[in-house]
Amino acid sequence: EMLRSLVGSEMCIRDRIYQLNRDPRNFTVVMWLFIMMGVALVVYFNTSPSEPRERDYVYAGSFYAFSIWIGFGVLALRDLIVRIARRNGAWTAGVATLVCLAVPGILAAENWDDHDRSHRTMARDIGWNYLQSTLPNAIVLNYGDNDTFPLWFNQEVDDVRTDVRVMNTSYLGGEWYIDEMKTRANDAAPVPFTLPRSKYAFVNDMVRVIPKVERPVDIREAMDFFRSEDPRTKVPLVDGTTIDYLPAQRLALPVNKDNAIAAGIVKEEDRDLMVDTVYLNLRRGVLDKSELMVIDLLSNFDWKRPIHFTQVYILQNLGLTDYLQFDGYSYRLVPILTPYDRRVGEIGRIDPDVIYPLLMETFRYGNVSDPRVYVDNFIQYNLMASGAREAFARAAKAFLRRGGEGDRDKAVALLDAGLEKMPPAQIRYTFSNTFPFLEAYYAAGEMEKGDALLLSYAENLMQYLDYYLAFEGVQGDMVSGLIDDKLDELGQIYLLAGYAGRRDAVARLNDYYRTLGATDEDLLHVDAPGEPTDSLLPIP
């Protein structure tokens, strides 16, 4: 199989010699193209070992040179046939072409399955899911390429949710993009920025936060202060120039409850949950321009338009992560305080009635449940970053906590659907996308389903551990951190099995721990499971 994969390389090397013998001058040109667009670029760019995505397109020029040499293989074989047959004619070129077609045929046969994307639609579906999780006329703030381009594709090509305004915060450092956001796009209204161009065009790339006032300052007053040209609103620098700054670390964002309900940001029945004021905490002493523009947006939107975020990272420096609602993919800014609980590890509140139809009917997952679809590391990472599978478990837990009529059945349906749409055979186990399912299955009384998932996850962890433990010396040191991680995951589900009284699961894991040298004193007793920590409670 390896030899078949190297056919192209062997042909390239042989035909490189053929061109050198027949046409040295042009050989030099192609060789320089190969070197300068390949090895030289590797040295020049000094590319890091880990990249967010494949960067092989940088070396496309060297691929062209490689292909030129492979193409010379037809000429080389044709000359060989002429020498052997001692005849020259059109048939010699035909025979050479037919024989050489085996090269791309072999390469296709060996590599097609790894590169076939005919059934894979995950890149498009990520954008679909983000857009469908937003309210009408919303502004969705995103951060990177992976949560921007799929949304643009859905809007501009497939005409999906063109009422939503997509705003990439990493572009807000450019005055051209801010100007663009101030204009209408498709069916989406402009972003209600208020800062004049003189305050963001080629100035204020970084903005100081100097707390002249200890108390929280109304966000509108703070932006009026920043917008002012009064010399008293500036701070001098050592070179004599002055710069704008924000005068408070805590900003108060008043809540217009009627507007929030009218825009669909909060349900009428949740009116009493709303706070009167949302407080921003500017944790750093300096903001970049994108953060300044987000503050400007918040100071002026008056809760008339929903604001969604694809990543909570955008809000961490503004101290707003306690005012979010998770809608399956995006996070909605809501005037409801939901403090982050480290024991649970979930950011924001959740409305199970809102998220249930989205998860069960609306969202798409790129056909990853189809075994024909190759789920590469890039898809794995994006599903992990968006919390796609654990969203099902989180919604299930919300139903179980509420405990209303039919809520348990909905919870189980969510758990089953999450594993069906993104099966472990395709989407690899991680602690974050598996452990919540175990908690919820056991809390719902679905012990057999919980056991099956737990044992499958445990077997996967044990295979990793057996592989890592086979390394010794320096290599063993290199994987020691991975061993610790897998042991920690195994220990967590072991304690959960004990807490839930799953005797067969505990016994299976006890057997494995004994192979690692554990004694009976170190293990849970099957008939007397141990007590869990707070973090292991199925329903917090």
Language model features: what each stretch is:
Residues 1-4, 9-10, 14-59, 65-137, ...:
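ER/secretory pathway lumenal C-terminal domains and tails of membrane proteins involved
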Residues 149:
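Residues that form or flank phosphate/diphosphate-binding pockets in enzymes
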